[in-house]
Amino acid sequence: MLKLGVHKTFKGKRLYTEVWKDVVGFEGYYQVSNLGRVRGLDRIIEYEDGRIYYMKGGMMKTTINNKGYESLRLSKNHTRYNKTVHRLVIEAFIPNFDNKPCIDHINGIRTDNRIQNLRWVTYKENMNNEVIYYSQHYFILSVYTIVLSG
């Protein structure tokens, strides 16, 4: 089920429509938006000893992992899972018809998890992104697709 909302960005100067979808594998627990945000849903947790706990939903805080991607920890059935935000976004919004294993950040910014910045790619396509590393910053020279004729 899609839920629409309005999300203010950059000091309220621009409004975007934010679309929410359930996180694949965590339906009823978490949702992810087309803008790359993740929220937990209100739910009731029942422990094995019979205790019942009401958990209020809200926006999830993310951290930057050692590869520079936004990540977070999701819980389901008393088990915790480490997930990257870009994978949650693309799995919810873009079908992987060609079964490509990698996700490419088109503009090269690993923390930009908006749906329009993500695409499914092969390992080879992912390696074709020319990147210049300068100090601790990186810049994409070009993103291109190889077309084979013959």
Give the ranges of each region predicted by the language model.
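Conserved recognition-core residues within compact binding domains
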Residues: 2-103, 108-150
